[in-house]
């Protein structure tokens, strides 16, 4: 749990005159070409950020299938084409191309046969599957070759999208492919086929591998920089629309589909978790979508859905676009693909029985933003007996239920807007006074408090008895950005009630007469699995007096909310912080101010490289924090231990990103030459020295040569 990244051993060098990091002992695979790498790859991370350590198979992996505008459209198995092919638009299919699939089978065999992936796995199962895939691939090419190759571009086809027909019968064909023993390769004549028809078939190989060889891939979700792990079978039919996958699900009720949401570098990846016949685990159908309003029901003419997805993702990231919605989902037993197909969810579990969402009472507590510490006053949550797995948080549906929830005072309709946000890291930095069935609850009995940088989520154990919350006092970073209640300025609202029978999660807002109309607070409580979740959030921060009461007993009056956060002791803040408050307490130290325009970048969710990019950019453009001495970078500030702690955290998250190309890694979007390259080298050395607990003493004028050697050695530690 937390910020755990799974990656292979890497080695690279940083040179002062080069503007890029050069891989030296690894094989560059833009995406995973091995089962081993896939098993280690967090789903929430862009799969193009993987390195494998088998240089002998370089020629069997493609560097980049599409040009830059198509980047991200291809999943890992689609890279199993020799990089010299450089597939763009129309693909010229020959026996040579198909032979790459066979080589890919041998590639997988080299890992499986050497017991590097699954010692108890039958090698022949995997090889059979891949050979069967090659046969089916060839047949598919012949079936779906475009009528007019001049029009065969990936953006859509006037003659009909071959992906449609592919997904119409995929439920039957993958079973046939997986059971077709040792099918011989059919090369046939040279055939022209659109890349749009090729890629789904390449991706389908992952289905066959997972279904026939029973390889359990580790499932992970990247929650805004934190990786949540679970174990399941993940089947990835590829980049298509959920509406098309829905055709399969509606025809197979036994699949019991559930919806989860993961994060990709270019937006959100909404997928369906389903049951697979003959397997105890589950399959993951992935589709690149941000929210349901961009999922189309039919083929698009002239533009690929991914372009829409990226465009909408950028809108959300740049403008924090509001989506009208209700506050939670229907209970699972009342849900199916027809009634609520777009439930956004994140998960953390060891078993995949996690979608146990229960309605909660229609009455909730009052909540105020009168101080930096939100206070909840006496709310009774009815207990629900039975055990369940943990669900980090459940996010609202988008369109399955009306956006208008309830009427208050007769005629006033309250409408909520939703901004996408994610739980980042579990923390125990909090004080809580609670009464649990008449007994004071000890700290250990309260599972966790999530400080997200965007909202606060209170989690308590599930019980058959009522849980009465008296006070929740948060001592940590609390910022309010997510739920924006739209309430008439003349209305003094104390509570909003919702109808229990519809499965709504009740929410409420409190309008403090001393605050501006835009500062209304909102909150929601939901019972999910074995936990009860208490969500606090607000749309705008009031410019009011705040009393900051850190644990040292001091009390300070401030005028600004962010200033109040900045006064909290560093040790009381939970990592990772909301980035806008990360450096404020140390404004005279490492960085003076973080340029918030960085959040306009499409890599918004990849918090680690963005943090480091911002820091490096600051170091590059400001000389007040450091100075040069005889070509040797030498810091002019003292770095406190708490800042070292942050740098250690940053280092742990940045390692995976240092080896990626400029196009996909915002960290390397800067050009480092000369002094700037030394800045990067110094900064990496700083991160490494923190992570390894090395001395933070810096070279002096009298030890220039030794100092240069020291920092070179420190920077080289980044390899391991």
Curated annotation (Swiss-Prot):
Lipidation (N-myristoyl glycine): 2
Keywords assigned by UniProt, alphabetized: Lipoprotein, Myristate
Organism superkingdom: Viruses
Name this protein carries in UniProt: Uncharacterized protein VP4
């Amino acid at each position: 749990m937390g910020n755990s990244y799974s990656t292979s051993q890497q080695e690279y060098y940083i040179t002062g005159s080069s503007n890029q990091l050069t891989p030296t002992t690894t094989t560059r695979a833009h995406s995973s070409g091995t089962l081993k790498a896939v098993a280690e790859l967090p789903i929430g991370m862009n799969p193009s950020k993987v390195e494998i350590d088998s240089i002998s198979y370089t020629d069997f992996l493609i560097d980049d299938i599409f040009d830059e505008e198509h980047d991200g459209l291809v999943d890992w198995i689609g890279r199993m084409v020799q990089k010299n092919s450089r597939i763009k638009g129309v693909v010229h299919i020959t026996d040579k191309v198909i032979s790459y699939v066979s080589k890919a089978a041998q590639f997988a065999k080299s890992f499986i046969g050497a017991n590097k992936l699954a010692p108890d796995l039958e090698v022949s199962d995997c090889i059979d599957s891949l050979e069967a895939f090659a046969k089916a691939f060839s047949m598919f090419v012949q079936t779906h070759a475009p009528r007019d190759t001049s029009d065969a571009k990936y953006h859509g086809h006037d003659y009909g999208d071959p992906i449609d027909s592919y997904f119409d019968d995929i439920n039957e064909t993958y079973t046939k492919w997986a059971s077709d023993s040792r099918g011989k390769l059919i090369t046939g004549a040279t055939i022209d086929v659109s890349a749009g028809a090729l890629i789904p078939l390449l991706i389908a190989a992952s289905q066959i591998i997972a279904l026939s060889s029973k390889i359990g891939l580790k499932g992970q979700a990247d929650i805004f920089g934190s990786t949540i792990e679970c174990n399941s079978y993940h089947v990835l039919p590829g980049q298509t629309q959920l509406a098309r996958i829905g055709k399969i699900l509606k025809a197979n009720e036994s699949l019991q589909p559930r919806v989860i949401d993961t994060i990709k570098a270019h937006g959100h990846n909404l997928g369906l978790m389903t049951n697979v016949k003959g397997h105890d685990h589950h399959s993951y159908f992935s589709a690149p979508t941000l929210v349901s309003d961009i999922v189309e029901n039919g083929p698009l003419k002239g533009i690929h859905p991914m372009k829409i997805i990226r465009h909408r993702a950028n809108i959300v990231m740049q403008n924090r676009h509001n989506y009208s919605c209700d506050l939670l989902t229907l209970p699972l037993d009342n849900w199916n693909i027809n009634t609520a197909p777009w439930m956004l969810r994140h998960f953390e579990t060891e078993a995949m029985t996690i979608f146990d969402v229960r309605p909660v009472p229609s009455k909730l507590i009052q909540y105020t933003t009168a101080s930096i510490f939100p206070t909840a006053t006496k709310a009774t949550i009815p207990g629900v007996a039975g055990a369940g797995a943990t669900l980090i948080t459940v996010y609202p549906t988008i369109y399955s239920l009306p956006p208008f929830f309830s009427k208050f005072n007769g005629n006033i309709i309250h409408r909520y807007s939703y901004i996408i946000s994610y739980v980042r890291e579990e923390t125990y930095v909090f004080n809580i006074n609670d009464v649990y069935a008449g007994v004071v609850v000890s700290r250990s009995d309260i599972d966790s408090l999530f400080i997200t940088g965007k909202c606060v989520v209170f989690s308590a154990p599930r019980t058959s008895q009522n849980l009465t919350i008296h006070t929740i006092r948060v001592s940590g970073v609390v910022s309010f950005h997510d739920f924006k209640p739209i309430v008439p300025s003349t209305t003094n609202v104390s509570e909003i009630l919702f109808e229990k029978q519809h499965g709504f999660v009740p929410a409420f807002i409190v309008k403090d007469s001393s605050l501006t109309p835009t500062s209304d607070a909102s909150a929601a409580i939901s019972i999910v699995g074995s936990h009860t979740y208490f969500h606090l959030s607000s749309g705008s921060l009031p410019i009011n007096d705040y009393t900051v009461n850190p644990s040292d007993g001091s009390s300070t009056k401030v005028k600004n909310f962010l200033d109040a956060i900045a006064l909290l002791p560093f040790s009381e803040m939970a990592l990772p912080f909301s980035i806008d408050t990360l450096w404020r307490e140390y404004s005279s130290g490492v960085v003076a101010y973080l340029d918030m325009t960085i959040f306009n970048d499409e890599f918004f969710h990849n918090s680690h490289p963005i943090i480091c990019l911002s820091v490096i950019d600051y170091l590059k453009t400001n000389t007040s924090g450091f100075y040069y001495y005889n070509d040797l970078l030498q810091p002019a500030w003292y770095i406190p231990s708490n800042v070292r702690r942050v740098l250690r955290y940053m280092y742990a998250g940045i390692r995976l990103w240092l080896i990626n190309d400029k196009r996909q890694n915002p960290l390397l979007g800067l050009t480092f030459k000369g002094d700037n390259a030394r800045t990067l080298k110094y900064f990496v050395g700083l991160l490494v020295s923190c992570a390894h607990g090395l001395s933070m003493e810096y070279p002096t004028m009298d030890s220039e040569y030794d100092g240069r050697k020291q920092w070179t050695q420190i920077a080289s530690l980044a390899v391991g």
